[in-house]
Swiss-Prot record:
Keywords: Ribonucleoprotein, Ribosomal protein, RNA-binding, rRNA-binding, tRNA-binding. This is Large ribosomal subunit protein uL5. GO terms for biological process: translation. It comes from Rickettsia peacockii (strain Rustic). Part of the 50S ribosomal subunit; part of the 5S rRNA/L5/L18/L25 subcomplex. Contacts the 5S rRNA and the P site tRNA. Forms a bridge to the 30S subunit in the 70S ribosome. This is one of the proteins that bind and probably mediate the attachment of the 5S RNA into the large ribosomal subunit, where it forms part of the central protuberance. In the 70S ribosome it contacts protein S13 of the 30S subunit (bridge B1b), connecting the 2 subunits; this bridge is implicated in subunit movement. Contacts the P site tRNA; the 5S rRNA and some of its associated proteins might help stabilize positioning of ribosome-bound tRNAs.
């Protein structure tokens, strides 16, 4: 059922062990969690917009997201403290592998003019962050039922100590990289 989890356990661990020669099996990098964040700037004007974003993120992730609140007021953005401005969901264990599989196999091939991810998206500690400009690349989202096209930020948090280990780990899951 979870092909990516089996792929990690059977092939990727073995390849990481060969290339980086870890002394302990607990040193081998793994994906800890995937965080999907959807910022909704229009929510300052219309509070109903946040409900549509929550519904979209629920369909995409299979888990109910948490609504994020503004930490402080910013007058130029017409933003008040504790105003709803987005939503996020944290995926772990089986749901994480399920989402990663749908992302790589179904969603990324549907992105227009997608060449791959840049290696510059790593943060120096083995975590990888990228953005998608539209939520309709996921098959769970019905194009006719959405109000506007929204983007999202996806962060893949790994236990890798370096970006090189993390690149090798994510390349094993067939995440496309260029340069």
């Amino acid at each position: 059922m979870l092909r990516f989890k089996e792929l990690y356990q059977q092939k990727i661990i073995e390849n990481l062990q060969k290339n980086f020669s870890y002394k302990n099996k607990h040193e081998i990098p793994q994906i800890k969690k995937i965080v999907i964040n959807m910022g909704v700037g229009e929510a300052t004007a219309d509070s109903k917009v946040i409900n549509n974003a929550v519904n979209d993120l629920t369909l995409i992730s299979g888990q109910k997201p948490v609504v994020t609140l503004a930490r402080k007021s910013i007058a130029t953005f017409k933003l008040r403290e504790n105003m709803k401005i987005g939503c996020k969901v944290t995926l772990r264990k089986d749901r994480m592998y399920d989402f990663l599989e749908r992302l790589v196999i179904v969603a990324l091939p549907r992105v227009k003019e997608f060449r791959g991810f840049s290696y510059k998206s790593f943060d120096g500690k083995g975590n990888f962050t990228f953005g998608l400009k539209e939520q309709i690349v996921f098959p769970e989202i019905n194009y006719d039922k959405i109000d506007t096209i929204r983007g999202m930020d996806i962060t893949i948090v790994t236990s890798a100590k370096t970006d090189q280990e993390s690149k090798f780990l994510l390349s094993g899951f067939n995440l496309p990289f260029y340069n």
